[in-house]
Amino acid sequence: MKKIFPIIAFAFLLLSFFCPIIHFLILFPEANPNCVRVGIFYYVWYNGTWENYIVDKPILGYYNSCEPNIINQHFKWFTELKLDFVLISWWGIDNKTDKVTKEVFRIVDENGNFSIKLAILVEPFNETDNGYNFTQIYSYIYENFVEPYPYLYYKLNGKPLVCFFNDEYLTDHYNGEIPKDDRFTVKIVGTRKYVNWVHPCYNSFFWENEIPRERVYTIAPRYDDTRIPNRTGYVIDPDYSQGYYQKEWKKALNYAENSSLDIILINSWNEFAERTQIEPCRDATSIFSDSYHIFNLTKNYISELKNGVKEPSNGYDDPLIFIVIALLILTVIFKIIYDLAKR
C-alpha cells in the first residue's frame, strides 16, 4: 500500500498543474494566440422613440436599449453567432448609454456567459472646445466596468481594451496621439488616416480597398445614409444585390487563412440610421424577404472562420488539447493506482 502514496501524490501534482491552465484558457479565450477573434459594434442609445428616417424595423420592434429582455435576446443572438467580444458605444458619464452599459454588464454577468467579452468604445460626447478629461474617463471605465467584471471585460495584449472614436474634439486635436493609461490597451477607431482600426462608413479613406490595419479587418454589410439630414448621401449596396458583404467576408477569410489578421470587426449589430445593422429586421429595400438573411450569412461566415481556418499551432495553445492530454495522463495514472490497489 505504501507504493501507492507516491503515485497519488504525483497525480495530485499533475492536477494542480493542469487545472489552473485549463481554467484560465476557458475563462480567458483571448489568451489563445491562434484564434481569430470576431467583435461587433453595439449601439445602446435607443429609447423606444426612434427617428423617423430609420426605415428598417427590428423584429423586436422599436425597442428601448435598457430593457432586460432586449439585452438578453441580443446576447442570445451574439452567442448563436459565436462572437468573441462586443464594443459598446458609450457617450460619457451619466449619459443614457452609460446607464445602459452598466445594465448590459450586470445582465451578462448574472447570466454567467463569459464566452462573450465586453469592451467600451468612447464616443465624441463633448462637442465643444473644452476638451476631454482622459484621466477621468479611464478611471471611470476601470472602476465601473473593469474592476467589477474582471472575467467579462475583453483584454487585448493582456490589458483591458478601450477604444476611442475619432472626432474633431476627441482625437483630432492630438492627431491621434491621445493621452494613454498604462492599465489599458488603447485603440482609436474611425475614418481618419491616423486611426488604429477602421470603422467602415461613408468617408473611410480606404474602406473599399482596405487591408488589415494592425492585423484587424473591419467589414460592414452595406452603408446608406441618404435619409439622415445633413449627410453625404453615400450608398453602398443598399438592397444587398451587389453581394458586397459576401465579398468582404471572403477577403477576411482569405486573410485569416494566410494568418494575416487577429481580429475581424463587424460594423454593426444595430446602427439602423446608417443601415449597417445585421440584427434581424424587416428591411425596407433588401431583395431578400427573410428578416434573418444577413444575420444567417454572418453566422455561416463566422462558423467557416472558426471551423474551417487551419492556423499554425504548436500543439499546446488550444484548451481542448490541454484537457485531452490531462485526461489521458490521469487515466493512465489512476489505472496504475487501481492495479496496485488490487495486489
Describe each region flagged by the PLM.
Residues 1-33, 40, 312-343:
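Secretory targeting signatures
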Residues 27-312, 316-317, 333-339:
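Glycan-processing catalytic domains of CAZymes
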